[in-house]
């Protein structure tokens, strides 16, 4: 099986063309491939499939290292767009894809960045899903014998965003896994730790559902900005500084889609016998 290794701000992916190759990924195979010592190693596996709708270009599937399938990955979406152009699967700059959650448009810019229409953030608790009676800008949760104030949103996947004074000293490794599997998140959640530097600039670390802390989480950056705007903390255009680098997020508010712009890097191509 041929594959490519790619990354978006250090969030790394194994990308496989299932348009021209006949491949099947069981959870066991994904876990084996994800092993950084015995396999290929990655944060997530991205699979390019033929579209289910003639109006679309591709179907986009995402798997975590534990073999579970997820509906959204912003950094992966940028790598997906670069991959299909690099491999000659399309020459379009505007690429329309379906995911387990819906549809997305990926745009490759003139300077080889990728702009992703992430859709409109959804704050309805049932959409996240999150156990709450109504939409609130801030929820109060109990976790690890602490009272946590957080914002909750779906970007096609569940996100919880906590404001911290300094991301360098935030309890990502201890509080992250506790909140990820908190009973109020029946499908678990991605946990963002957000430091507001100013209205146009935040620093962010994300403990990802099924993957742990990563160098960057695209949908997590989108979620943090959406929550920050909802809470009146941020402007419509925000620079997000992650451990792996920078993303630019723009959202005009309710009724509008949110846009993420950032890099996608091809590292190498490989072949593995399954």
From Swiss-Prot:
The active site is at residues 73, 217. It is found in: Cytoplasm. Substrate binds at residues 11, 44, 64, 74-75, 157, 190, 208-209, 218-219. One of its GO terms (molecular function) is diaminopimelate epimerase activity. One of its GO terms (cellular component) is cytosol. It catalyses: (2S,6S)-2,6-diaminopimelate = meso-2,6-diaminopimelate. InterPro entries: DAP_epimerase_AS, DAP_epimerase_DapF. Transmembrane segments: none annotated. Its main location: cytoplasm. Catalyzes the stereoinversion of LL-2,6-diaminopimelate (L,L-DAP) to meso-diaminopimelate (meso-DAP), a precursor of L-lysine and an essential component of the bacterial peptidoglycan. This is Diaminopimelate epimerase. It comes from Escherichia coli O81 (strain ED1a).
